[in-house]
Amino acid sequence: MSNNDEHEEHEHEEHVHDEHVHEEHVHDEHEGHHHGHEPPNLEPEQHREQGVVLFNSVWEMLDMEDRTPAQDDQMVHAAHASRWHWSQAGELGGDQQLAVGEWQCSRVYSMLSRGEPALHHAQACLAICQASGLSDWVEAAAYEALARASAVAGNAGEARTWLARARTATAAIADPEDREVIDNDLAAIAVLPILSDG
């Protein structure tokens, strides 16, 4: 899940480039006196579009060989923003998008070697899958995220347990391309020093 082709396989979503979404600037009768910042009222379709755009932008940053600390922070914010926009998309969103949003947040934190938040979002991803009956590649991705986050957190035993569950779930994925994506991720986890040295 570290290149554009893999993103499309996981999301099955088109890149959305909306050049016609404009925010109106609202000025009250006391211009110059700000009484707080109200979030713009976006339509569900606009939330969906922002969720997709931000999701793809996170992948672009994950694919960068060298990121600055500022870019790391931007990547974290974009992942959370994407997840939030999907939660506001109504019927255009759904449990799968929410689970994948949590999965991406976990991947971002794992890439930044931040085990605790990586585990938190991986657990949230699995919880959504279990509560909504999601299976196939989404469930396998949740186990993959838990294995990766556990390894990052320094818990080799937990990482191996989740890795085994991820392999079982991955073997049951219907689409061979989706199965290959998860298999590649699991192979990368298996050779992490904390696991390959044990």
Region locations from a protein language model:
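Short coil/turn linkers that connect adjacent helices within long alpha-helical scaffolds
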Residues: 44, 88-92, 128-135, 171-176
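Residue signature of alpha-solenoid helical repeat architecture, marking inter-repeat boundaries
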Residues: 45-53, 73, 93-96, 137, ...
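Histidine-centered metal-binding segments
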Residues: 1-39
